[in-house]
């Protein structure tokens, strides 16, 4: 035994070949946490002193090779100064550099995901052999940072500037064959043959069949491209990367490119220093704080979903009531994850529409090469369309997805309750109707919950699981388990008008309506909010949702929260709806819609909208600075999020933030409404509320904000 630790061991195999194995005790995956970094440095010390080692393989005892750095440690680490972060990273890099410089060949045997620091560990080896089931990549830019353990330095020298920039800037991991084509790995083999293949490579190095020292040397020197070739590579990459990610919103790719431009002409050790300085700069951006926080929130939400699922019944078959686009989307989602599902409607044309939706979605996957035609047929066979309830006796859970009308929903739920087994869970896919109210029609209200999918079902990850007054833990558990089984991220919320997401969204629409009443141009508001980071502004969003849906939802919300969601004027949204402008669904809303070459609706300006809005705009029109537009819309949005926490509609800031990002597209780089308030500072946010309180209750600071500001608290821990 060369080294024995609880994170890494080094043992001798045969013929002078050592096996350095990552094996984090009591952990599901290997990662570069503080203890692993410490032990890695100790391993390097031991290897430098060993005189009987001729070669070495790097392996993992886990299903994952190495998942990367321990992101939970980033929060504290990134609170350090930029200079301290740089020194911290350089210190870690010292062990990587010394490992690379060891006087014998090293081969990484990549059995599973090698991400971030895991990929960087493989790059300090001369050769990399990969299981055909593994993935490899440098996803750090998705956290607002970029590789800091030599990843930008070695990748540019191993796979070239253009390939390295694409790998780093997109953050997308590569499958084995793609990694092989890129030159990121040297061979791919079946998982069972991996260790033997790695040992064989080491033996070829030892016998001088392979020039491993030349492979190492190319990572120690500047990139072998002349200035013109470098300029072409960087300019091409910048054009592609900046077209996909606005550097003002997501600065990490731009900072990575800047660091690489500086270090491509430097030897390794100097280049590592440049990388470390750039990494430290990225780590201190608010976007890194938000995106690291978002990752941790995502982990928490998934952990809470597991906890909520503990009392779940087995789900062997589901059913959806109501076909059409929504029902078909739900059926597709279940079937694509291996769950048989019955799709029931009273009209055969709706069943055709639902099956057509599922077929269309699967057909697109076939076209992209994601699945085979045979797999498509197998998936479709899991969906059973029917006009009657004959097969419902053994169904474990029924999702009601009929028209958004409380009387229709109550009647349908009452009917199906009498036809299913006693422990069958009933779930209503409603966006605004009270679950407690719908439950009044049922004999077994404890078996009833809300299950709010977002449209389009196949693309929107969030599902709100709504607890009514009488919903049992078993019902909640089973519904959460179903959502997870369907590949969705469930967030459990308590019952109220609009639940969580729509309750927060409608004050945002209300703030937008008030801006228009006072003279703002809806197209300009859209541009401002898109620049702020939203995928679409409020006018475009309500067009996509449907103005009819918006008006109906606003009526429900006004009844539930008349103090802040019942305006004393007719707004632009309602007026356009009354003039039969429904948005994309009938081609005219705030914008006019024309089909592009791909058959997708494209928005264009429509003078008729401005004519109609003259009747809902004040005669003494105001002009608004862009920041005022942002402040007014975001105050209404964030205040209602905080009120949902106050009212225990949602349990944690993490769940609230993730729901707003996944459900309505809150800018991820801002971390969610709670983190947005934290980054603004509670005192500054409170002052902004007081500045705009004259506009109405929606703009007044919730008591929770006042209490937190007085106590010097934040939504997220600062240490």
Swiss-Prot record:
Disulfide bridges in this chain: none
GO cellular component term, pick one: fatty acid beta-oxidation multienzyme complex
Pfam families, sorted: 3HCDH, 3HCDH_N, ECH_1
Keyword Nucleotide-binding set for record: no
InterPro entries (alphabetical): 3-OHacyl-CoA_DH_CS, 3-OHacyl-CoA_DH_NAD-bd, 3HC_DH_C, 6-PGluconate_DH-like_C_sf, ClpP/crotonase-like_dom_sf, Enoyl-CoA_hydra/iso, FA_oxidation_alpha_subunit, FadB
Entry keyword annotation includes Lyase: yes
Cited SUPFAM superfamilies: 6-phosphogluconate dehydrogenase C-terminal domain-like (SSF48179), ClpP/crotonase (SSF52096), NAD(P)-binding Rossmann-fold domains (SSF51735)
Catalytic activity, as annotated: a (3S)-3-hydroxyacyl-CoA + NAD(+) = a 3-oxoacyl-CoA + NADH + H(+); a (3S)-3-hydroxyacyl-CoA = a (2E)-enoyl-CoA + H2O; a 4-saturated-(3S)-3-hydroxyacyl-CoA = a (3E)-enoyl-CoA + H2O; (3S)-3-hydroxybutanoyl-CoA = (3R)-3-hydroxybutanoyl-CoA
Residues of the active site: 452
Biological process per Gene Ontology, one example term: fatty acid beta-oxidation
Site (Important for catalytic activity): 120, 140
Keywords: Fatty acid metabolism, Isomerase, Lipid degradation, Lipid metabolism, Lyase, Multifunctional enzyme, NAD, Oxidoreductase
Residues annotated to bind substrate: 298, 502
Annotated stretches, region: Enoyl-CoA hydratase/isomerase: 1-190
Molecular function GO labels: 3-hydroxybutyryl-CoA epimerase activity; delta(3)-delta(2)-enoyl-CoA isomerase activity; enoyl-CoA hydratase activity; long-chain-3-hydroxyacyl-CoA dehydrogenase activity; NAD+ binding
Signal peptide: none
Function recorded in the entry: Involved in the aerobic and anaerobic degradation of long-chain fatty acids via beta-oxidation cycle. Catalyzes the formation of 3-oxoacyl-CoA from enoyl-CoA via L-3-hydroxyacyl-CoA. It can also use D-3-hydroxyacyl-CoA and cis-3-enoyl-CoA as substrate.
NCBIfam families membership: FadB, PRK11730.1
Protein family: In the N-terminal section; belongs to the enoyl-CoA hydratase/isomerase family.
Protein name: Fatty acid oxidation complex subunit alpha
Organism of this sequence: Psychrobacter cryohalolentis (strain ATCC BAA-1226 / DSM 17306 / VKM B-2378 / K5)
């Amino acid at each position: 035994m060369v080294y024995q630790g609880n994170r890494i061991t080094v043992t001798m195999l045969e013929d002078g070949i050592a096996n350095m194995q990552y094996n984090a005790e009591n952990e599901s995956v290997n990662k570069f946490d503080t203890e692993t970094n410490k032990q890695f440095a100790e391993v390097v010390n031991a290897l430098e002193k060993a005189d009987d080692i001729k070669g070495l393989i790097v392996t993992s005892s886990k299903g994952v090779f190495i998942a990367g750095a321990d992101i939970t440690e980033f929060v504290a680490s990134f609170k350090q100064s930029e200079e301290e972060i740089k020194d911290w990273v350089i210190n870690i890099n010292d062990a990587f550099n010394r490992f690379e410089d060891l006087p014998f060949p090293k081969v990484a045997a990549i059995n599973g995901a090698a991400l971030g620091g895991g990929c960087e560990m493989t790059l300090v080896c001369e050769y990399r052999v990969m299981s055909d089931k593994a993935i490899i990549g440098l996803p750090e830019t998705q956290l607002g940072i970029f590789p800091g353990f030599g990843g930008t330095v070695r990748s540019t020298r191993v796979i070239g500037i253009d390939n390295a920039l694409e790998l780093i800037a997109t953050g997308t991991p590569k499958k084995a064959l793609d990694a092989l084509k890129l030159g990121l790995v040297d061979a791919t083999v079946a998982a069972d043959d991996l260790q033997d293949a790695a040992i064989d490579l080491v033996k070829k190095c030892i016998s001088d069949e392979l020039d491993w020292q030349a492979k190492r040397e190319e990572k120690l020197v500047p990139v072998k491209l002349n200035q013109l070739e470098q300029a072409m590579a960087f300019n091409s990459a910048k054009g592609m990367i900046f077209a996909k990610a606005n550097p003002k919103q997501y600065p990490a790719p731009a900072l990575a490119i800047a660091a690489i431009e500086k270090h491509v002409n430097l030897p390794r050790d100097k280049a590592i220093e440049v990388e470390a300085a750039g990494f430290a700069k990225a780590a201190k951006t608010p976007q890194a704080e938000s995106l690291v926080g978002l990752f941790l929130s995502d982990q928490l939400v998934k952990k809470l979903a597991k906890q909520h699922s503990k009392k779940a019944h087995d789900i062997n078959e589901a059913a959806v009531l109501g076909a059409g686009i929504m029902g078909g989307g739900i059926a597709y989602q279940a079937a694509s994850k291996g769950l048989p599902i019955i799709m029931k409607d009273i009209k055969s044309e709706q069943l055709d529409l639902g099956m057509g939706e599922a077929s269309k979605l699967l057909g697109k996957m076939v076209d992209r090469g994601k699945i085979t035609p045979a797999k498509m047929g197998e998936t479709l066979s899991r969906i059973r369309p029917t006009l009657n309830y004959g097969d419902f006796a053994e169904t474990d859970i029924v999702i009601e997805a009929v028209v958004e009308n409380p009387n229709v929903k109550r009647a349908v739920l009452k009917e199906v309750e009498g036809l299913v087994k006693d422990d069958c869970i009933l779930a209503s896919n409603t966006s605004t109707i009270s679950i407690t109210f719908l439950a009044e029609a049922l004999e077994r209200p404890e078996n009833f919950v809300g299950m709010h999918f977002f449209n389009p079902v196949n693309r929107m990850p969030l599902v709100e699981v709504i607890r009514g007054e009488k919903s049992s833990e078993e019902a909640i558990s089973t519904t959460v388990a179903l959502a997870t089984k369907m590949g969705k991220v469930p967030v459990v919320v308590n019952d109220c008008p609009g639940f969580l997401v729509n309750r927060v969204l409608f004050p945002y629409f209300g703030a937008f309506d008030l801006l228009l009443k006072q003279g703002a141009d809806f197209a300009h508001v859209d541009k401002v909010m898109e620049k702020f980071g939203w995928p679409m502004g409020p006018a475009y969003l309500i067009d996509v949702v449907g103005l009819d849906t918006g008006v109906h939802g606003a009526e429900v919300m006004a009844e539930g929260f008349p103090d802040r969601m019942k305006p004393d004027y007719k707004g632009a949204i309602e007026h356009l709806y009354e003039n039969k402008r429904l948005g994309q669904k009938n081609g005219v809303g705030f914008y006019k819609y024309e089909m592009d070459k791909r058959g997708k609706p494209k928005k264009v300006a429509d003078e008729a909208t401005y004519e109609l809005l003259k009747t809902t705009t004040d005669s003494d029109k105001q002009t608004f600075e862009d920041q005022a537009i942002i402040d007014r819309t975001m105050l209404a949005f964030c205040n209602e999020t905080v009120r949902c926490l106050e009212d225990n509609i949602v349990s944690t800031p993490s769940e609230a933030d993730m729901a707003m990002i996944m459900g309505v597209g809150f800018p991820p780089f801002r971390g969610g409404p709670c983190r947005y308030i934290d980054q603004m500072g509670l005192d500054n946010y409170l002052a902004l509320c007081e500045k705009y309180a004259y506009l109405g209750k929606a703009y007044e600071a919730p008591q929770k904000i006042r209490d937190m500001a007085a106590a010097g608290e934040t939504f997220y821990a600062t240490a």
